[in-house]
Amino acid sequence: MTRKMTRKTNRSGNSGGKTGGNRARNRKTSNRKTGNRKSLVPKNLRRKLRNTWNKASLKQRIGMIATTLVATVAAIAIIAGLIRFVGWRVQVSEAKAAQSEMRSLYDFNPGNIISDGAFFNGNALSERQVQTILDQQGATCTGDKCLKTMTFTTQSQAADEYCQAYKGGQNESAAAIIYKAGNACGISQKVLLTVLQKEQHLLTATDPSDFQFKSAMGLSCPDDANCDAKYAGFFNQVYGAAKRYQYYVRHESQYAYHAGALNYVRYNPNAGCGGSDVYIENKATALLYIYTPYQPNEAALKAGAGEGDACSTYGNRNFAIIYNSMFGNPRD
């Protein structure tokens, strides 16, 4: 009898022990679960928010939900904007590094071909200084169509938002037109002389054709179309180009190239030749790309003043080379 009672007590003890252990484990598990669910919002604030929600009308609840959604969307937009900005900064840094390397290797920076100070200086040269340059560059020209001795009839131009008034006349020399156009429109005479040489080699031509004078600055003469007759003639080309540059300044947003931004600039009219992102550093360089929308590829730069490959274009490369040869570094 005593033995049976002892065994029963032992079984009860074992049973009780298991139950106690289970309870202990359950308490630990419960504590862990509670810890996992612990809110980051303070208890008092949770209670206040709950009371506010419970007391709110349907309209107020809808307003609270809408406010929360708007705040969430705004936060997401801010984060997305920051991500884009950081990505843009990385792209700009990479573009600037590539441009710096090109400048070191070839003395050409596609993002800073010429400084604003050098470009927008309408008093860079006097009429006499322009004539001296024409005489020097055209020293081997002896015919009756040399730019240094040619004269033209010019038309008076009223002042407008782009240029000051230009007083026309009979038998104006090329030097007078270049000086007066640059002075009226605030464009460097050095730039105008450089473009005349870049586009039609008029400064050094020994027997220039009528077409060279008609399209002297390449104004409204795209690579893939005929020239606009409205701008034909030496005066129309020189004065028109100076005015067009100022038009570009005031309407830059209408064009594809912008200062202080990354711009994709192609190497060639053929899109298959590719291009690269260029961080354009100033307005003058942006205007050159609006006027001539291509950059030299590496083959063109390696060639110096020579020819590159089938994808090479030379307009902006030649601008830098010609300007530098006559007037020094265009970036100074």
Feature annotation, model-predicted:
Residues 2-11, 17, 23-28, 33, ...:
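Non-catalytic cell-wall polysaccharide-engagement segments
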